[in-house]
Every structure is written in structure tokens, then in C-alpha cells.
Regions:
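Generic structural signal for secondary-structure transition and capping sites
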Residues: 20, 27, 44, 48-52, ...
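A short, surface-exposed loop/turn module that caps and links secondary-structure elements
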Residues: 44-72
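Exposed loop/turn and edge beta-strand positions of beta-sandwich/beta-sheet ligand-binding modules
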Residues: 1, 65, 75
Length: 111
């Protein structure tokens, strides 16, 4: 059975945000390219094995089923996603120092 993939627009926005921050603000364009490739590659890996991540552990019940996995080579960044047994829903990519529960609640409440 093929896994369905849904990607929330917030994922693309955050990848672009951090890519630009690394490339421009930190003046490291090669690292920014590696970051984007690592984030995209991680989504493909999750398609093959959605159980790779672990429960994020958020208290609000509407966030209780969200999984997280670190971006390879960039451990301060994580991809947050849901897996219902058929569909992989990639929600966002965040720096782990953020106020993650409120950020994710805002994202998932927006279609």
C-alpha cells in the first residue's frame, strides 16, 4: 500500500525561512543548501518509514498525536508530522528552541 503525503504550507515557509537565515544572515549558502537537502530527504525517508520519529509529547490533546524527528546534520531543527496509518502529514519544520505547542496549534488550526 502506498503512503499518501500531505505537506502543510507552513513546512515550505519554514524551510525557506531557515534557508534564507542560514544563507544570508549567517553568510553560509553551502550550509543552507545542505539544510534544504537534509529536510527534503528526511520527508522522503519518512514516506518509507513513518514510524522513525517519536511522539513530541505536547500536553494539549489536539497536539498529542504529533510526531517529531530531528533533521539529519541539523539536530536543533525538527520536522513535526502526523501519521494515521495511511497518510503522512508533514506539518512544519521548527528550531527546537521555539514555543512549539503554541506555534503548532496555530499552524494546524489554519487549513
Amino acid at each position: 500500500m502506498a503512503v499518501k503525503l500531505r505537506v502543510h504550507p507552513a513546512f515550505y515557509r519554514r524551510v525557506r525561512h531557515y534557508r534564507d537565515r542560514i544563507a544570508i544572515h549567517d553568510a553560509r549558502p553551502q550550509v543552507a543548501d545542505r539544510f534544504v537537502n537534509a529536510a527534503q530527504g528526511l520527508v522522503f525517508q519518512l514516506l518509507e518509514n513513518p514510524h522513525r520519529g517519536h511522539i513530541a509529547g505536547f500536553e494539549p490533546t489536539d497536539l498529542a498525536d504529533i510526531l517529531r524527528i530531528a533533521v539529519p546534520g541539523f539536530p536543533v531543527f525538527a520536522v513535526f508530522y502526523r501519521w494515521d496509518g495511511q497518510t503522512l502529514t508533514v506539518i512544519t519544520l521548527e528550531h527546537t528552541a521555539q514555543d512549539l505547542p503554541s506555534r503548532l496549534a496555530g499552524i494546524i488550526s489554519t487549513p
